Amino acid sequence: NIMVTKQALETSNANLNMIQSRYNSGFVVKSDLLRAMVHIADLEQQHLLAESRFKINEAMLNASMGFGEANPLNPVTPLTIRSEIHGTVDTWIDTALSKRPEMDTLRLEEGIAKKEIAKSQSGHYPDVSLIGNYEINSEDFGDSADNYTLGAVVRVNIFSGNRISEETKAAKSMLARVQEMQKSMELGIKVQTREAFLKAKSARERIRVAKIAVDQAEEGLRIVKNRYNNGLLTIVGLLDAELARQQAHTNYFKALHDYKVARVELELAAGTIDTDFQ
């Protein structure tokens, strides 16, 4: 993380100035100064590596979006908690089952299959048609009719060579396949949504714990720095405190990142993600 390594470098350089001052005054040995310099060199390598990874990821993202590799990216969404997760896992599952477009497609296919069954079965039923005829026998236009005929025609399919039964069987088979796909899709959506919900909840709790660890690491470094400055602690203790602080910040930002990703996965699973998502 570029921000974490940059912050760690600033802290280590400040501590190096303190160690240099104590060395010049004869309070610490040269090995302390050298250890601090080695530590800073290691942090500089970490910072350069973080910057390199960022540029590589930026180029890959540009390529995936069809932009030029050198196109600068300016993220507009900060790595902070912008919204909490509300509702229970069952609520999210119900939303997913009603919002996911895949389920809408299968429900539409189910309706079509049922209509095909009804259509094929209608071939067994009699077909009734009404006919009529109306004539006016006059040289002039008039309001009365001299002749009219009304009738009905009934057609009964006595034998179709099992054609209708086969059509019905095929339609029922299609309905069974669609309903089986619905069950499988529904189960998959439930599992996916539950997993995304639990991951988001876990990441949110990790943020809380990581924030406490950051505060503790900051306070620990302050205490250790004062003790070292007063000659009550070795350079090893100071460097360990710096590393603990750096790791605490890394864990905190990783938890924030994981929560963001989990939120996206949850919204995708529920079928509710849109361009306004943050």
Model-derived features: positions:
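Hydrophobic, lipid-facing positions within transmembrane beta-strands of outer-membrane proteins
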Residues: 92, 148-154, 196
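Residues on the lipid-exposed face of transmembrane beta-strands in outer-membrane beta-barrel proteins
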Residues: 61, 152-156, 255
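Periplasmic alpha-helical coiled-coil/stalk elements that build and connect Gram-negative outer-membrane
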Residues: 1-95, 196-199, 203, 245
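Amphipathic alpha-helical coiled-coil segments
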Residues: 1-3, 21, 39, 57, ...
